[in-house]
Amino acid sequence: MTALQALYREDFDHGRAIRLWLYVVAALVFAMVLVGGATRLTESGLSITEWQPVTGALPPLNEAQWQMEFQKYQAIPQYRQLNAGMSLADFKTIYWWEWTHRLIGRVIGVVFFVPFVWFLWRGWVPPNRRAGLWMILALGALQGAIGWWMVASGLADRVEVSQYRLATHLVLACLIYVAVVWTGTRWEDERVQPLLGKLYRTAQTMTVRAGAIGLMLLLLAQIYLGALVAGLRAGHAYNTWPLIDGGLVPQSSQLFFEVPLWRNFFENPLTVQFDHRMLGYAIGLLALLQLFNVVKLVKHGPVFASVLLVVAAVIVQVALGIWTLLSVAALPLALLHQATAMITLTFSVIHAAITIPPKVSARTEPSLQ
């Protein structure tokens, strides 16, 4: 083995270690989103009424501490208006959901920060990659603050958190997830990076690239709408399909009665659910169009495989969405619907990441496969 080959092998091993680290972080973010969904659906998110990033890592350890936490919860409107008479045992159930959600957030911070500092110290992170990783770390810190900002909205004058803040919290989590998966997928040397290949500058390939990015962005928008649906409990109304409020398209007087007009898109349960349905149909059509465009270029290889996964996931997700609606947002189906949304987003990120080739150097010739 030559010195150059040994150096390349060492760099490749470093890259493999960093990719593994990023995929572990992504798995933890995925888990946190699901636990966050369960916390929301079980209405557990207001059970911890304080934000203590360090000392809050420990749960109540004795009966006196549990009673103290319960008394804090009893002082907020949600308890007085919705859960008056709740037993301590029932309170513990909702408390553990929220505590677990926050604990995973703390674990993510440690799992990201400690190896990141180690990789930097060892010189394993190329200079052109560092800014992206620092940005992910900054977004993670911001997410903790936004999580408390969301919880705080339900502690004084409401019995639930603001749907605006809930949607912001979820979408930022998804943006962090996208950034981590994207970075891990593309953390490869040009010689092993899967590409569309020599056609990457043609109109057809640029169409595929645009379609991949478009799908990913629409899925993020759909997740935002899904959060509004959850925040407004819109999944507990208009539980028919394909009709909604008695028609394929509701009457405009019902869709747009809020003033000013823009509020309907965020505060009117009918409008929010209708938008969520329509965007789901649009994503399904775009996924099929993307498959058609990819097949015109390649019929095997990573790009083809990834678009098949996207299409399959979208179809399953649409079916699950309908089933969840008809079940009046039954908890197991609602959680499965959220999990499948994250899986669909994962496939779309991978598909987009491998359709965009790295810079081509003189030593590198992209492969169509």
Annotate each predicted stretch with a short phrase.
Residues 1-369:
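Polytopic transmembrane helical bundles with strong interfacial aromatic enrichment
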